């Protein structure tokens, strides 16, 4: 039975809205809805009905299913097939205003606080392109080694949905801002490492739609009502479309993670998946190994982390292989990743290609760029993740250390500044990845939120190197430097923690310890050499851990063996 929906729009909209909800609710009738002029906000709109979303049983783990080969060898079922995976990524840009109007584009505002006639689609309101959107598109295109279009245009992508007030989305169709690029990925060492290059088909500029908020449930199914928040409508996006060149969930997750690092290094987006600043739709099909023809494509949505993406792909690979082994047909559809049950569920059928009836946007001129503009933008690009990893490797760091340090642009910048102070590479890396990272995690701060400066950490490491303090003392001082700031030398002096390095003072200390522990001295000289640690411990206790360990051991051994 058809399900009805109504939508009340506010902000003085004096027109009727004709729409069809395209969610997984079966065949819905068209409904003409009068809008409420002058209402203070967009209000209750969607009455809930039973969802047709199908929860399917978890597939048999096909990767452990085997069959006998003619030679007597066994072959897992999954060895017969390969996945073909492509990703469409929407990157929400961090511009201060929206793509085609002056409304703020900030995340987390009160619903419908950042709206105007343009992003609400009111009659007569005309868009004006935000130049920062074009700049971001060119930066990302150049970072991807793509071809930048000297002349591109915007198009109207037409479809009806409650969160799309204009009835179309301003996007780019046949002439995008950038085409034919690639991303280089270093796979994690724990998964065997290796280098991969994945093609990027295109990058195009577009605007985001609004957002449906489902009361009583975060999904339409089971919600008591739904409301529309248009704060996100008109927020600028860059859509990055990959070539279908990934074959595993790990490769797909690492591709997406590298793209996230790239947009963060460029400073064009925070890439936060939990906030929706980076949304990935995965297209996956299965085919027998050796076959060129693609299988039936299934789209997966609702993955808000890279681990969820990897698990969703692996589940879907198992599900599709199991269907093929049973002789069943794979349906072309959109499926949702459900975190709770750790499986994909059917959302809606996608038989055939959607007809969005693209045509050129008549209210916006072509985007015309000069070669000089492109060259200047290229010259001002920051060092990108892949180049930074290669540089760190050239400094002698392991691939594991390189991946950790270059993963976060802020951590990498901090590390580079510490090195500029003359700190030895491995020492700087060990402190940042070890004690600094551990304390930041315990107090839930990022490296940019902490009071510790690169100069202060470099100074702390220098104090260890010149013998002013021991590593133990440095670790005691570090939390204060992270939480309160200040110089390492100042903290050492104010607490009286300078290392005791005067040979005469250390010799006097050792003489007293040996005099107080005559039996242990005799036992040591009788062959129990492990007692050396006992004497060192006594010296550390007497000095509060401040005695220079190198000098201590030298003087102690001379006294014990003399």
Curated annotation (Swiss-Prot):
Residues 48-76 are annotated as: Disordered. Residues 64-76 have a biased composition (Polar residues). Gene3D superfamilies: 1.10.10.410, GatB domain, N-terminal subdomain. It comes from the Eukaryota. The keyword Metal-binding does not apply. The keyword Chloroplast applies. GO terms for cellular component: chloroplast; glutamyl-tRNA(Gln) amidotransferase complex; mitochondrion. GO terms for biological process: glutaminyl-tRNAGln biosynthesis via transamidation; mitochondrial translation. Pfam families: GatB_N (PF02934), GatB_Yqey (PF02637). GO terms for molecular function: ATP binding; glutaminyl-tRNA synthase (glutamine-hydrolyzing) activity. It catalyses: L-glutamyl-tRNA(Gln) + L-glutamine + ATP + H2O = L-glutaminyl-tRNA(Gln) + L-glutamate + ADP + phosphate + H(+). Allows the formation of correctly charged Gln-tRNA(Gln) through the transamidation of misacylated Glu-tRNA(Gln) in chloroplasts and mitochondria. The reaction takes place in the presence of glutamine and ATP through an activated gamma-phospho-Glu-tRNA(Gln). Belongs to the GatB/GatE family. GatB subfamily. This is Glutamyl-tRNA(Gln) amidotransferase subunit B, chloroplastic/mitochondrial. The lineage of its organism: Eukaryota, Viridiplantae, Streptophyta, Embryophyta, Bryophyta.
């Amino acid at each position: 039975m058809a399900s009805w929906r109504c939508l009340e729009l506010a902000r003085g909209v004096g027109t009727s809205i004709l729409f069809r909800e395209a969610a997984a609710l079966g065949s819905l009738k068209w409904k003409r809805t009068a809008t409420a002029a002058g209402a203070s906000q967009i209000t209750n709109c969607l009455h809930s009905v039973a969802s047709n979303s199908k929860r399917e049983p978890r597939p048999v783990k096909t990767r452990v299913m085997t069959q006998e080969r003619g030679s007597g060898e066994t072959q897992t079922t999954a060895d017969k097939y390969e996945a073909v995976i492509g990703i469409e990524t929407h990157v929400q840009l961090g511009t201060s205003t929206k793509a085609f109007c002056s409304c703020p584009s900030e995340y987390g505002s009160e619903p419908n606080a950042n709206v105007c006639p343009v992003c609400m689609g009111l009659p007569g309101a005309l868009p004006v392109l935000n130049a920062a959107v074009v700049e971001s598109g060119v930066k990302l295109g150049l970072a991807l080694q793509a071809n930048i279009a000297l002349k591109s245009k915007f198009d109207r992508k037409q479809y009806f949905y409650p969160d799309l007030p204009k009835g179309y989305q301003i996007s780019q169709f046949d002439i995008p801002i950038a085409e034919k690029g690639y991303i280089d990925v270093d796979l994690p060492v724990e998964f065997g490492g290796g280098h991969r290059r994945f093609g990027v088909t295109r990058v195009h500029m577009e605007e985001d739609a609004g957002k449906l908020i489902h009361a009583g449930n975060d999904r339409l199914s089971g919600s008591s009502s739904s409301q529309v928040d248009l704060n996100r409508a008109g927020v600028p996006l860059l859509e990055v479309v990959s070539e279908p060149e990934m074959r595993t969930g790990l490769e797909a997750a690492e591709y997406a993670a590298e793209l996230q690092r790239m947009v963060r290094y460029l400073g064009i987006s925070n890439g936060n998946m939990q906030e929706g600043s980076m949304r990935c739709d995965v297209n996956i099909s299965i085919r027998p190994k050796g076959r060129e023809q693609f299988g039936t494509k299934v789209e997966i949505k609702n993955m808000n982390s890279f681990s969820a993406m990897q698990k969703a792909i692996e589940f879907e690979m198992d599900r599709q292989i199991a269907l093929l082994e049973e002789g069943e047909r794979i349906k072309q559809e959109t499926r949702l990743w459900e975190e709770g049950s750790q499986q994909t569920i059917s959302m809606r059928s996608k038989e055939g290609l959607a007809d969005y009836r693209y045509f050129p946007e008549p209210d916006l001129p072509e985007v015309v760029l000069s070669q000089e503009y492109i060259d200047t933008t290229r010259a001002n690009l920051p060092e990108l993740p892949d180049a930074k990893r290669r540089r760190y490797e050239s400094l002698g760091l392991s691939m594991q250390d390189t991946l950790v340090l270059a993963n976060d642009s802020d951590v990498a910048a901090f590390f580079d500044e510490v090195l500029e102070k003359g700190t030895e590479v491995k020492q700087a890396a060990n402190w940042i990845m070890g004690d600094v990272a551990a304390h930041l995690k315990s107090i839930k701060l990022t490296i940019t939120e902490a009071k510790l400066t690169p100069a202060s950490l470099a100074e702390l490491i220098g104090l260890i190197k010149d013998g002013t303090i021991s590593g133990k003392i440095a670790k005691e001082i570090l939390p204060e430097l992270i939480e309160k700031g200040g110089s390492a030398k100042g903290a050492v002096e104010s607490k009286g923690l300078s290392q005791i390095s005067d040979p005469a003072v250390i010799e006097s200390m050792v003489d007293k310890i040996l005099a107080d522990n005559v039996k242990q001295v005799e036992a040591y000289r009788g062959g129990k050499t492990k007692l050396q640690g006992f004497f060192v411990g006594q010296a550390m206790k007497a000095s509060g851990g401040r005695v220079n360990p190198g000098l201590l051991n030298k003087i102690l051994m001379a006294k014990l063996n003399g």
